[in-house]
Curated annotation (Swiss-Prot):
Name of the protein in its database record: Photosystem II reaction center protein K
Subunit organization: PSII is composed of 1 copy each of membrane proteins PsbA, PsbB, PsbC, PsbD, PsbE, PsbF, PsbH, PsbI, PsbJ, PsbK, PsbL, PsbM, PsbT, PsbX, PsbY, PsbZ, Psb30/Ycf12, at least 3 peripheral proteins of the oxygen-evolving complex and a large number of cofactors. It forms dimeric complexes.
Key words of the record: Chloroplast, Membrane, Photosynthesis, Photosystem II, Plastid, Reaction center, Thylakoid, Transmembrane, Transmembrane helix
Membership in a protein family: Belongs to the PsbK family.
Annotated organism of origin: Nephroselmis olivacea (Green alga)
Amino acid sequence: MSTLPILLATLPEAYLPFRPLVDVLPSIPVLFLLLAFVWQAAVSFR
């Protein structure tokens, strides 16, 4: 069971060029959350 997190954390060799993209993708929902706050601040929280 100790090898399972390692298998989930490493990409297969075929996908290694996409590693920077995979590192960025999980943060996109956080950016949408921040965008919602900026948008509401722009319209004065109607």
